[in-house]
Amino acid sequence: FPYTTLFRSSVQEGARFLEKPQGGKGVLLGGVPGVKPGKVLVLGGGVVGHNAALMAAGLGADVTIADISLPRLRYLSETMPKNVKTLFSSTHTIEQELPTTDLVIGAVLIPGAKAPHLITRDMLKLLKPGSVLVDVAIDQGGCFETSHPTTHANPVYEIDDILHYCVANIPGAVPQTSTLALTNATLPYVIKDRKS
């Protein structure tokens, strides 16, 4: 599935920019024995958000997925590892989560529409300095008010002491993997079309 690269890379890049030498707060998402793990908030429980949460959970992070679909939240609650919690998404619930969150993955996608801004500039002050926002929805306008597209050459910028990673083509950082993933996903359709 081509999005595999996207969701895995979003967590990997977020974890990298949480490192102190990269400008982050110096948090290891998985923690170590005797030290609490990092906290990840995933906005959107669709394919990308679900799998980003799985990736973060696999690293040992404390993960929360926020979504507006109760049936989707029920499904996620039943299928996710124990270190993943679900939360109904609203401005109020997001504001409650931000003070203890290290990494926010914005994975909100509304097909054919611009992504909603779920985190405003005013809300940035709720995060601790050195926290990281990764906007996977940047191709649809971004789901953070302060998002603007970045490149692999200059992937992050800082606003109000919060790092923003808004690379428009996240899989482009790992072209060998992403090309093979896309080929594997599309090849069956090409073969089927040739047989027709």
Which residues does each PLM region occupy?
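Rossmann-fold NAD(P) dinucleotide-binding segment
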Residues: 95, 99-100, 113-133
